[in-house]
UniProtKB/Swiss-Prot annotation:
Mn(2+) 1 binds at D8, H10, D41, H196. It is found in: Cell inner membrane. It comes from the Bacteria. It catalyses: UDP-2-N,3-O-bis[(3R)-3-hydroxytetradecanoyl]-alpha-D-glucosamine + H2O = 2-N,3-O-bis[(3R)-3-hydroxytetradecanoyl]-alpha-D-glucosaminyl 1-phosphate + UMP + 2 H(+). Its EC number is 3.6.1.54. This is UDP-2,3-diacylglucosamine hydrolase. SUPFAM superfamilies: Metallo-dependent phosphatases (SSF56300). PANTHER family: UDP-2,3-DIACYLGLUCOSAMINE HYDROLASE (PTHR34990:SF1), UDP-2,3-DIACYLGLUCOSAMINE HYDROLASE-RELATED (PTHR34990). One of its GO terms (molecular function) is UDP-2,3-diacylglucosamine hydrolase activity. The keyword Membrane applies.
Length: 240
């Protein structure tokens, strides 16, 4: 048996090929799975459970079917932080806190989306702090659907433009932030996404940091079992 981790699928109505590949992954890759963890940014944008698009509702039905066979866990990302309990119930997903510690086959491991580790990106961290406020989230939820969609589109546009101007270092995790989280959680193994740079990092202090990749051009799946770990890419044609 094994536990699977994915993230950064960025599903949208504009890229139904990704949704199709993910659906086939759910159909073919979970027979021997103990659990599935989705580490954020399942959707490209999420402005509220009351504005779920048809493709998202269909996906919820598929995830619900999966959840009847094995637990499906979800951690919010920077794109879908407004995904709420209503959609999670429809999809059979259990929403986890921003940082979660697990015992994976005897190994204490901390999992998260990963954006909180990119501390050199000061502008984004200010936005992240604001959006985490309950009052800000409540006020946003009170806005009309059209207004929320407009704000989301503006944020996406600004983010894309800003990211093109940021350096590689700023966009990646900050080593001190990584070390601090290891110390805080008393773990030596970490799994996250967000940076879209899949890799297995063996750190000098004996810790291990694994990054799951995005699903823009191919799938990225981390499999963890008692025998070890396997970070693999999943070509879309292989998932069809």
């Amino acid at each position: 048996m094994r536990t699977l981790f994915i993230g950064d699928l960025h599903l949208s109505a504009d890229r139904l090929d990704i949704t199709q590949a993910f659906t086939r992954f759910l159909d073919t890759e979970l027979d021997d799975a103990d659990a599935l963890y989705i580490l954020g940014d399942l959707f490209e944008v999420w402005v509220g459970d009351d504005i779920a698009l048809p493709f998202a509702l269909e996906l919820a039905e598929k995830l619900k079917q999966v959840s009847q066979k094995l637990p499906v866990y979800f951690i919010h990302g920077n794109r879908d932080f407004m995904l709420g309990k209503q959609f999670a119930r429809a999809a059979g997903m259990q929403i986890l806190p921003e940082v979660k510690c697990l015992n994976l086959y005897g190994i204490e491991t901390v999992i998260l989306h990963g954006d909180s580790l990119c501390t050199l990106d000061k502008a984004y961290q200010r936005f992240r702090k604001l959006r985490s406020l309950s009052l800000a989230r409540w006020l946003y939820g009170c806005l009309s659907k059209k207004t929320r969609q407009g704000i989301a589109d503006k944020i996406r546009s600004n983010s894309k433009s800003s990211n093109q101007q940021k350096s590689y270092t700023i966009m990646d995790v900050e080593p001190n932030a990584v070390d601090a989280l290891f110390a805080k959680t008393h773990t030596k193994h970490m799994i996250h996404g967000h940076t879209h740079r899949p890799a297995i990092h063996q750190l000098a202090n004996g810790c291990q940091r694994i990054v799951v990749g995005d699903w823009y051009e191919q799938g990225s799946v981390l499999s963890v079992s008692a025998e070890g770990i396997n970070l693999q890419s999943l070509p879309f044609e292989q998932a069809t």
